[in-house]
Amino acid sequence: IAEQKIKTTIAHSFAQKYGPFDSTSLTNYVEPYLDSSNYNRSLKNNSNKPQCNDLIKHFTKILTDNTKYPPFKHYQTKHGHIPIWVFINKLTFGEMRKMFEVLKIQQNISNVFNLTPSELRSTLIYLNNVRNDCAHGANFFQQTYPALKSSIKIISDFETTFSFQNSSIGNLFTCLCL
């Protein structure tokens, strides 16, 4: 539920800011999510190149490798492009988290959750770690999950309601419910 809500919010905010289709012609069309000007280019990778370049390269590979994926095929055939709200559903949680980290519109997205960009980033990292442990068969009772900051409103409100404050099991349960 949380993953879909976050993806939907990113896609909606992105389309609002950059448009679902930013060209009058398909001749030189570039999907807005493949346009580096829509990302924060000051964040660098280990080679001192903008992180968004790696992300765009990876997104291009996703598009290339999934030409027969029914939603991609439909939009490409019927509309000539694949909008962000279709594309984002093919991303893993980790890919979506990395996308958020380099977006210029982090504040717009964070506002939907009544969080700061830093709080949402921390929440995404935490959820990504728990999600990966879940997906790969980790034993939760042997895992140590850091307690989330009480300032992260999504989590702290839920924990208060169910009296799970300062509990690793409570943090885990909260994330699973989200």
Region spans (language model):
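Long, contiguous internal "core" modules enriched in hydrophobic/ aromatic residues
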Residues: 1-178
